[in-house]
Regions:
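Non-catalytic helical/linker scaffolds that mediate oligomerization, partner binding
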Residues: 1-366
């Protein structure tokens, strides 16, 4: 049977909502640590509610944490804002006063930027074209500690960008630099903090983002052991580097994750279906379980019924051999988290029944 994960969030963080999701066929929860922390009371309360729901229904809790890893995200922002096509924006490391809206980005991205580059925001929701590099701004900072120490001067690079399409800029949004691979550390400082708490909170699996090769998985597995964790690693395929080293990733991962959001940015949308099929086929050939994620039921963020293409997508993922399916925003912030799980489970079950019929030679019956 296909294993179904739902992402926990404000739409489903209470025991009643989680019980409904479990009753509708959810097997485990995902916690997206790019938007929360195991150290926060709100996150711990959600885990407590999930455990209570599992205990009440007599099912084993499955808690997956999705690390921040080396992915590139926008910096923290007080308030989101909307960009219209053609609107200009300043791209820089820190959110300081500017005449135009600011997109704060990490050091790794600002160092890689050049005029003409295209920044893709939030799984391709919209993009920003880098027009030109602006005059850098020096900033003097005191190192602290010794009052006699000299100030250190930092030079902040700044770029002018222009919105290509309409979109919302928020803090902690995923950013992809088209045609370039820009990464931070395999395990971020925030990941280290979360991993110190993972065993205590009963984490049962870890999702590793932006895996580039099998060596990345080995590094994370060694790090997990240092925190007293010996749990499965779900390795997300999201880049060209991952595709180039797919064999080593399949060898080292416990589960391969076809993460279609950033993967589509890496290979282009028209190529995504074929890439998904090839990854699935390689995993099946190697007898490696795999998961399919991203926009499985995206319309159900606001609608109580999925679209025909969405249910067909789920069906085909199972036909291709997917062992796991997962939804993200559909359950974490969507209006109908329990219904999302119900449709995901029902369509997956129909696909499994079809496979059984096909094996028995009766699949042509309608």
């Amino acid at each position: 049977m296909v294993t179904v994960y739902g992402t926990i969030g404000k739409a489903c963080c209470n025991q009643e909502a989680l019980e409904n999701m479990l009753q509708n066929g959810m097997n485990g929860i995902r916690i997206n640590l790019s938007h929360t922390s195991l150290a926060l009371d709100s996150c711990r309360d959600s885990i407590t509610a999930y455990r209570a729901a599992c205990e009440h229904l007599g099912v084993k809790p499955e808690i997956m944490i999705d690390l921040q890893g080396p992915e590139i995200r926008s910096g923290n922002m007080r308030n989101p804002y909307i960009l219209e096509p053609g609107d200009e924006i300043i791209i820089r490391q820190r959110q300081r006063h500017e005449e135009k809206p600011i997109l704060p980005v990490p050091t790794a991205l600002i160092h890689a930027l050049e005029s003409g580059d295209r920044i893709i925001v939030h799984d391709g929701e919209f993009s920003i074209r880098v027009i030109e590099e602006l005059e850098a701004i020096p900033e003097e900072l005191h190192p602290g500690g010794d009052e006699n120490a000299e100030f250190i001067t930092f030079i902040h690079r700044r770029f002018l960008g222009r919105a290509e399409g309409r979109g919302r800029i928020r803090g902690r949004e995923t950013l992809t630099l088209e045609g370039k691979e820009v990464y931070g550390n395999v395990i971020s400082s925030a990941d280290q903090t979360n991993l110190t708490l993972a065993a205590e909170l009963g984490v049962t699996s870890v999702m590793q983002p932006f895996v580039r090769s099998g060596e990345d998985i080995i590094a994370v597995r060694e790090a997990l052991a240092g925190y007293g964790l010996t749990c499965p690693i779900f390795a997300k395929i999201e880049s060209k580097s991952a595709l180039d080293h797919l064999d080593s990733i399949i060898e080292q991962a416990d589960v391969v994750v076809i993460a279609r959001g950033d993967l589509a940015n890496a290979v282009s949308l028209p190529k995504l279906p074929a890439v998904q099929k090839r990854i699935a086929a390689k995993c099946k050939q190697a007898n490696r379980p795999f998961m399919v994620v991203t926009q499985m039921l995206h319309s159900m963020l606001t609608n109580s019924v999925p679209t025909r293409p969405e249910v067909t997508d789920i069906f085909n993922a199972v036909l291709d051999g997917a062992d796991y399916l997962m939804v993200t925003g559909e359950t974490s912030v969507g209006r109908y988290p329990a219904e999302v799980i119900r449709y995901l489970r029902e369509v997956a079950s129909e696909a499994e029944a079809f496979l059984a019929e096909n094996a028995a030679g009766t699949a042509c019956k309608v």
